[in-house]
């Protein structure tokens, strides 16, 4: 296929038009008084959102060169979202400012490589200063503030803070759509996995359709149990102890299941059988997790163990087990704390090494089940459109909060970027490098300027006043007041601000050093069908 090629100034100008189109659509959402953007959907109602990355991903431009520019900035938003989970609009605003300022200087004759060096120096200094001024997040109220700022909703802030307090920093917090209007929190403490009872005859509470076992023994195996003789020795020992039994196996079927059910109904003993969670290697790992949590052993042929040789000493124990049709929850396992900590450390190490997003998610789930628990925020709204928008905002707030726990918080509302201004301005450089540093300095002003513009104010006036204020004092666009941002609870996670700045600078530097752009030539439109000259079906009667 033939290619269309543009060089130097013409190439950069074409791409800049795409950058501006995308950034102008995204930046209207910045700040407490930012607006929404409506996205058309091929099916169903349109999506209304103020989430930068969602808007950026939707934008496709007709001109191939403009589209390439737009896609470069969309990558800034996407990468920031992957790393920090929020701050995508800030990243887009920073990228646009750096690209525009940079192009002015390249057009005026500056060397792009010199500009790139200056930009990299300035961003490195800014990030070091951000680390210095960031404060560790402490207590439930600080977490609530971070979440409330991101979601622009105090109620959501409180919910997320409560969820993190209950399940810990390693716990998993997921979002689900509620059937009602209200947004509420549901916390599952202990280890839960998605396998229910093998037979409904095993339930102990017919109203709730669940089996509750108090202080049970737990038999854990990766084998299929179809012959009752295999587990008879250990079953007799459990009956002598007068305790209920939970069996976790690959499957319990045939004669073994029938015998267990009959004896359960007769009242001989209280037993519930469930299938082992997961598949393949993940199943082995999850069974090992359950064994460590409950102080038991996995009875597997790989370790030379068979079910007939199992004793009560090789069984796990827990304070309580609740089994429903779909889930099993093990609460208060009596496993050795040191072994549990070692297992958590092992999973954390795997988390750092893995590159697969799916594996990362599954490892995070396993970590949460061992370390804390799982919290579910059920998002409610009056309409489906509002529900989607609300869910996106809460997702951002959740990511923002996790980022704050990792690297601490800085003053929000773009104030922290202005607080590193002096540090960046003090870098000694000459020529094009100095110009590169000035490009970053100009970009650092842009988020504050845009927040003020979205609030209906003159951005330049706010920026100039902020330069003269003490560190930490900023402009609260929601109220129009000048306040101490940290004390007022207007904060941003340091990780979000850092990622936005790094990713924006990276793409801007690449953009400025571009000298040629190659795109596919648009295919010519196919010629129209010739006129059939009145050849109707009537003239084809002889073919019948």
Curated annotation (Swiss-Prot):
It is found in: Cytoplasm. It catalyses: ATP + H2O + a folded polypeptide = ADP + phosphate + an unfolded polypeptide. ATP binds at residues 29-32, 86-90, 413, 476-478, 492. One of its GO terms (cellular component) is cytoplasm. Induction: By heat shock. Keywords: ATP-binding, Chaperone, Cytoplasm, Isomerase, Nucleotide-binding, Stress response. One of its GO terms (molecular function) is ATP binding. It is an enzyme of class 5 (isomerase). It holds the Pfam family Cpn60_TCP1. PROSITE patterns: CHAPERONINS_CPN60 (PS00296). Together with its co-chaperonin GroES, plays an essential role in assisting protein folding. The GroEL-GroES system forms a nano-cage that allows encapsulation of the non-native substrate proteins and provides a physical environment optimized to promote and accelerate protein folding. PANTHER family: 60 KDA HEAT SHOCK PROTEIN, MITOCHONDRIAL (PTHR45633). Belongs to the chaperonin (HSP60) family. Forms a cylinder of 14 subunits composed of two heptameric rings stacked back-to-back. Interacts with the co-chaperonin GroES. HAMAP family: CH60. This is Chaperonin GroEL. It comes from Bacillus cereus. The lineage of its organism: Bacteria, Bacillati, Bacillota, Bacilli, Bacillales.
